[in-house]
Amino acid sequence: MSKLYTEIPEKLQQFISEQKIFFVATATADSRINLSPKGMDSLQVLGPNRVAWLNVTGSGNETAAHVQENPRMTLMFTAFQDNPMILRLYGTAKAIHKDDAEWQMLFPLFTPLPGARQIFDLNIDLVQTSCGMAVPVYDYVGEREQLNAWAAKKGEDGVKAYWKETHHTSLDGKPTRFA
């Protein structure tokens, strides 16, 4: 029931563009595994073996801490409507921050979001689909606006202060670039 690909076929690129949510998983050799839901129309397919997503401020910064030490990353998408399917993208990622040269090239590809803190650039070495027949059917209602409103109210300086206060280490004490 599963299929493996060495790149993202056109039909799966279309599937990705239609999804409202995806999940990202990372870990270091000795840390907890982090699995986070993402949305906000923050992901772009940059080619058959490359995707990037704009990461906004959240309650932690686990993904960035993990990628500095171990760049392995998995993204998962699942169909909640229509035909069932689960899509996983496996690869190695790099965290790109606002002071990195690549930021200037990649950031214009995204809708600007308040509190944006990194872009994760994922080079994909394996694509897998599986049936997804056990995934329930859900209806998309809309985006949550609380995070954008929170970041806009704090302003850029307030968000940076929040990063310094709360995002300098992961749950396992791994450093981030916000120390």
Annotate each language-model stretch with its function.
Residues 1-179:
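Binding-site signature for planar aromatic cofactors or substrates
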